UniProtKB/Swiss-Prot annotation:
Induction: Induced by both D- and L-alanine under aerobic and anaerobic growth conditions, in exponential and stationary phase. In the absence of inducer, high basal levels of activity are observed in cells growing exponentially under anaerobic conditions (at protein level). Strongly induced immediately after deflection from aerobic growth.
Major localization class: cytoplasm
Pathway assigned in UniProt: Amino-acid degradation; L-alanine degradation via dehydrogenase pathway; NH(3) and pyruvate from L-alanine: step 1/1
Enzyme class: oxidoreductase
Protein name in UniProt: Alanine dehydrogenase
Length: 371
């Protein structure tokens, strides 16, 4: 199979969808790999590295898109890429379609077979291709929150860990999944007083046990969450409903009563965000103000640390990439129920029930294509 990897063109997206080790494994199995020149530079992987592993380096994105049978990306296609999508090609990438009707419409119009990293799900409910980037985004969220709390960047002028005689920052983390857990871990490591909210008592027990009570855990009720947010210096939203839009858990009226200079970091922005006022931002312009607070809603946070993110991501995606290349998408998905859950579109049909519900579009069960 011919596998293609274009350069990512989203704002400040420096990750790449494959490493030289992945190229070597694909070519060892008899597959061809073409990579757009410079695709790995942001992750400190040179064209020479890819070529030495067996890839062919091509000059343009158009050539990669037009020739590849299996196209690997990191982030969802954006408008300049819509016209390149085509029937007969399999696209394997993060999609987050519930938050993007234009991308969904473009995929359906093109007839492309698309499989979303973020909805590949095991029988136990694990999300193996979302987890590594959730770890990165969670850890980054505490760092960027601390950064924007500095007065010179519009924040309250609060140090996360405080100093002897001065209280540390109050940090509220909404959601104790992979991203929230990692956010809480780093924030607590910086010395902040951290409170984690979640609806799953067993998850809260795990957090409490692992941190020996150093992180406060609270069952998420509207009343208690609202009161905690109002008192917080930093709020990190890490809520996930796989494949669907994130629920809006922090309202504009609550934000209006927060401390001036408080910071809100919305990790869930890829899925529409979990704060009422959230809207996607970029690494170039990462923040905006609501009332007297600072919102940070960068939709590709891990793109800021591509050397770490690229290798973390591809360590998880490559087993699935190899299945798709070896068997084709139908046989691969028919033999792997986790991969099948990632199926999003095929031949103009929307195969994700959660996306169909959120965007009010017709849903088609993927099972009919896998029989």
């Amino acid at each position: 199979m011919l596998v293609g990897i274009p350069t990512e063109i989203k704002n400040n997206e420096y990750r790449v969808a494959i490493t030289p080790a992945g190229v070597a494994e694909l070519t060892r199995r008899g597959h061809e790999v073409i990579i757009q020149a410079g695709a790995g530079e942001g992750s400190a992987i040179s064209d020479r590295d890819f070529k030495a592993a067996g890839a062919e380096i091509v000059n343009t994105a158009d050539q990669v898109w037009s020739e590849a049978e299996l196209l690997l990306k990191v982030k969802e296609p954006i408008e300049p890429e819509y016209s390149r999508m085509r029937k007969g090609q399999t696209l394997f990438t993060y999609l987050h379609l519930a938050a993007s009707k234009p991308c969904t419409d473009a995929l359906l119009a093109s007839g492309t077979t698309s499989i979303a990293y973020e909805t590949v799900q095991t029988a136990e409910g694990a999300l193996p291709l979302l987890a590594p980037m959730s770890e990165v985004a969670g850890r980054l969220s505490a760092q960027v929150g601390a950064y924007h709390l500095m007065r010179s960047y519009g924040g309250r002028g609060v140090l996360m860990g405080g100093v002897p005689g001065v209280a540390p920052a109050e940090v509220v983390v909404i959601g104790a999944g992979t991203a929230g857990y990692n956010a809480a871990r780093v924030a607590a490591g910086m010395g902040a007083h951290v409170t984690v909210f979640d609806l799953n008592i067993n998850t809260l027990r795990r957090v409490d046990g692992e941190f020996g009570g150093r992180i406060e855990t609270r069952y998420s009720s509207s009343l208690e969450l609202e009161e905690a947010v109002k008192k917080a210096d930093l709020v990190i939203g890490a809520v996930l409903v796989p494949g669907a839009k994130a629920p809006k858990l922090v309202t504009n009226s609550t934000v209006a009563h927060m401390k001036p200079g408080a910071v809100l970091v919305d990790i869930a922005i890829d899925q529409g965000g979990c704060f009422e006022d959230s809207r996607p931002t970029t690494h170039d312009e990462p923040t905006f103000k609501v009332h007297d607070t600072i919102f940070y809603c960068v939709a590709n946070m891990p793109g800021a640390v591509p050397r770490t993110s690229t290798f973390a991501l591809t360590n998880s995606t490559m087993p699935y990439v190899l299945k798709l290349a070896d068997k084709g998408w139908q046989a691969a998905c028919a033999s792997d129920s986790a991969l099948a859950k990632g199926l999003s579109t095929h031949d103009g049909k929307l195969l994700s029930e959660a996306v169909a519900k959120d965007l009010d579009l017709p849903f088609t069960d993927a099972a009919q294509f896998l029989a």
